[in-house]
């Protein structure tokens, strides 16, 4: 491979390491120079360093693209090329926003923000998405003006070379930002990668319009500008929605839930886990709370010591703060266990996605109360009252008609 050739190098699993120019992987090489422990992607310090590095590279490349396209647009008289140049200038501004966002998100908690500043990264992603939308509207507006007053485009080999080089650079920026966004689980970098992809499509369409004008004389500059603007609006709207969802609050990934359950249930003293809630205050600022079912007859001091150990294990392995509530359950009363099994069967008969916990059996002189919680997903066709009434009726129909249900409905947060 020649020294000046640009090529994309893919690792296993489709992960992109970088683009080689003259035998150097830019991002990987720079990371090896400036980022200590660069493969520890869960470290807040490493995340911040990657964000600053990515932002700095983005600023430099986008300024170079702006200068090249501005020259090409001025020479050719193409409104689409000139608009695309200023799009790259706004991208440089977006890279500055991303850089500042990572810088702020890495700050330590303070009295005014005890949970840290991790969500500043989400806010920077939000601002990048808004910048994408603004650029889309401006491009459509300028393209409408071009439709009203079309002008011939002066094409040249220099213009085409600049546009092709711009496409290659933006493809590179898309891949390295997407790769980092996956490794760091970064909304800001994902927004930047989508922005780079939209720029790639935009510049490709501009190149096509330029070539069509050169060889056919058709003035499609304005139409292609509108098409590019609509695509930019779509991508900007998509990333805006995703970032807003993160700020409002999303359910955690199922893989994360499974990891938590695996760690907690890996301790023999824990018989079950429920009421699991994940509080996300930004990347690296995750807190979880859950209820762990333990034997009611167990030694409370030993159980408490084990619960402390589990909390530390979650902190060490998943980098999250954990608070665990101990729920005592009966494990050696045959009558209680048999009744619990019957009620669980009813709950699963109503809907297999439902689960039951905190089951207690309180006997009185004339009646027996069955007290328990039913955990249901957010998406269910039943209302809380329908679930409670159906279960109460089935339980009251049990032999003897002396059983009465006291039911609490819990909704999953994942």
What are these regions (language model features)?
Residues 52-74:
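Short, contiguous, helix-prone interaction/anchoring segments in small proteins
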Residues 22-57, 76, 80-86, 90-414:
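Alpha-helical transmembrane segments and adjacent TM-loop junctions that form the membrane-embedded core
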């Amino acid at each position: 491979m020649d020294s000046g050739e640009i090529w994309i190098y893919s690792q296993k699993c489709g992960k992109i390491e970088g683009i080689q120019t003259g035998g150097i992987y830019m991002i990987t090489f720079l990371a090896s120079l400036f980022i200590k422990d660069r493969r520890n992607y869960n470290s807040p310090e490493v995340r911040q360093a990657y964000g600053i590095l990515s932002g700095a590279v983005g600023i430099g490349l986008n300024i170079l693209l702006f200068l090249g396209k501005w020259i090409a647009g001025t020479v050719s008289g193409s409104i689409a090329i000139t608009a695309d140049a200023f799009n790259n200038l706004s991208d440089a501004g977006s890279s500055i926003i991303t850089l500042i966002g990572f810088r702020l998100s890495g700050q330590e908690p303070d009295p005014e923000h005890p949970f840290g500043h991790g969500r500043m990264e989400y806010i920077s992603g939000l601002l990048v998405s808004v910048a994408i939308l603004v650029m889309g509207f401006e491009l459509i507006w300028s393209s409408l003006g071009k439709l009203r007053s079309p002008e011939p485009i002066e094409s040249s080999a220099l213009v085409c070379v600049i546009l092709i080089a711009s496409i290659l650079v933006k493809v590179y920026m898309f891949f390295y930002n997407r790769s980092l966004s996956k490794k760091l689980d970064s909304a800001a970098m994902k927004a930047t990668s989508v922005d780079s992809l939209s720029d790639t499509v935009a510049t490709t369409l501009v190149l096509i319009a330029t070539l069509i004008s050169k060889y056919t004389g058709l003035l499609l500059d304005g139409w292609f500008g509108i098409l590019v603007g609509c695509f930019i609006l779509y991508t900007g709207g998509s990333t805006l929605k995703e970032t807003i969802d993160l700020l409002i609050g999303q359910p955690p990934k199922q893989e994360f839930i499974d990891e938590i359950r695996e760690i907690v249930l890996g301790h023999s003293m824990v018989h079950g886990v429920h009421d699991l809630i994940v509080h996300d205050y930004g990347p690296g600022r995750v807190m979880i709370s859950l209820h762990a079912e333990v034997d009611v007859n167990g030694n409370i001091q030993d159980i408490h010591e084990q619960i402390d150990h589990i909390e530390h294990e979650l902190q060490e392995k998943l980098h999250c703060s954990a608070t665990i509530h101990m729920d005592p359950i009966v494990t050696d009363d045959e009558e209680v266990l048999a009744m619990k099994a019957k009620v669980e069967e009813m709950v699963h008969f109503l809907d297999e996605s439902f689960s039951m916990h905190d089951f207690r059996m309180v006997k009185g002189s004339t009646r027996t109360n069955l007290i328990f919680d039913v955990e249901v997903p957010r998406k269910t066709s039943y209302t809380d009252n329908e679930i409670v009434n159906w279960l109460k009726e089935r339980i009251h129909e049990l032999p003897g008609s002396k059983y009465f249900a006291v039911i609490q409905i819990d909704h999953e947060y994942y």
